[in-house]
From Swiss-Prot:
Its EC number is 2.5.1.75. Catalyzes the transfer of a dimethylallyl group onto the adenine at position 37 in tRNAs that read codons beginning with uridine, leading to the formation of N6-(dimethylallyl)adenosine (i(6)A). The record marks T101, R123 as: Interaction with substrate tRNA. Monomer. This is tRNA dimethylallyltransferase. Signal peptide: none annotated. The keyword Nucleotide-binding applies. Residues 35-38, 159-163 are annotated as: Interaction with substrate tRNA. SUPFAM superfamilies: P-loop containing nucleoside triphosphate hydrolases. Substrate binds at T12, A13, S14, G15, K16, S17. Keywords: ATP-binding, Magnesium, Nucleotide-binding, Transferase, tRNA processing. Its cofactor is Mg(2+). GO terms for biological process: tRNA modification. It comes from Phenylobacterium zucineum (strain HLK1).
Amino acid sequence: MEPRIWLIAGPTASGKSALALRLAEASGAEIVNADSMQLYAGLRVLTAGPGPEETARAPHHLFGSVDPADGWSVGRWLRAASEVIADIRGRGRPVVVVGGTGLYFRALTQGLAEIPEVPADVRAKAAADFERMGEAAFRTRLAEVDPAAAARIAPGDRQRLCRAWEVFAATGQALSDLQRTGAPAIADWSAVALEPPRPALYARCDARLHAMVREGALEEVRALIARNLDPALPAMKAVGVREFAAHLRGETSLEAAVEAAQQETRRYAKRQITWMRGQMAGWPRLTADDHEGQWRQFLAQEPGLTP
């Protein structure tokens, strides 16, 4: 019998990392990251990645392993994750894939088409169009050919908006359609999605920001902005980078920066929940508002596991 694969999805601060670690310890599994921001090195505190204590309790993969200057696509993550999962299972161990990036889970379970390389002149024209038209008009134009991408991509995400348009311009096909085709990378998987009550989730988001400041998030942002990277890179869009960078430049107080980051974290969690409800409607839900309750709910669905 092939080693098990468990998928654990959930919004930020929902408790999914704690559940994944407990499951890994109970089953002997290794943990694979499916969070697009926890990929990047130097942002462990800001992205709530695993620390030395967690990594000592179970092997973790694809956390903090990518330079922020190297922006990864969904396809690149899928190739890396598929290799890691195959290696873990080849050694006879189960796998827990955990994160909050819905596109990663969709690519893993439904497949991802090989998207042709976009010519440099098409990329340049998309970027120029964005600057000329502005985000609102550019998004409206994108919605005419790829409404799913236009609705899904977060405000201010120039890179993904341009990417969606340039793929259509180069291929004549919507990026959203291409992302739905291809062979699944894994089979015979089990999944849960965490969706604690909204008030408890938001309170946890707020508390987490204060803890991040105490644990060194400002120092991480200071080191990141000192590199003068392209602001369109994915790592530069991590929640807290823009807000804390404004404080470090003397443009706002620390209190105001924390409040702004808390608000953006809640918005991000809401977008993740919306994605889960639309794209993971068939995944069993864990709705408890604490780690113990979530673990009990999980065990009820996995009677073969022992606490």
